[in-house]
């Protein structure tokens, strides 16, 4: 727990430094970061400011299509094609090319929206299914036999036991299995997102709805799937460690000499010798301290207690 908090604190420092370098830090944003102690929430806060590689949305911005994306998101324009025609220049070939670029920008905005990401997470939490299938051509390999139970496997993620999950992940790491995690119904995710972002049924609204579907399929779903994959493996690892620790505890608590009574002595001078007696099953029968050495030098009393 302490190590995780230290890692989170270091991550906060990096995030704050990056946002400040961009000149986008505000008092409200700084307060949110300072008061956030959940790594997933912290990354959601940072996502809109995270330096990006050359994405489709960034390419569209460089073509000057962000104003068109803003118009589409407002969903008030009644003659969208005429408005899109105003952006046909340079690398933008035609109206459809302009609309496509604007949709890419909207899709990125949907992906970076905290509420949208949390809605998809909630659906994954309730109904995520883990599916494993054998990679074509691998089923006859010698190493594949131990994963035969998972060649065509599907189960709710929240019911998948740790040993099964770890076995599936080993099969994936060895290239035997292809593993996916997804909701039972993708439509519930897209419906929720459309209710959040789409207003009305005009030209702009249909474009936003298309962008929302693209955002979910291309950006949001893969990101949340990766997130749940890591979280589920972490939980499975923790459960495996817990089971191992419990088994080790039982082993260490087992009678050290089998079915025999045992007496153990922890020697000491000033504080005395601590004596413990166990029965044949390792259950505590008696414990007390004796003082055969100086300063008390109760040799005879100590001997009687030992014999008794």
Predicted features, each with a name:
Residues 4, 8-14, 18-264, 270-308:
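Duplex nucleic acid-engaging cores and interfaces of nucleic-acid transaction enzymes
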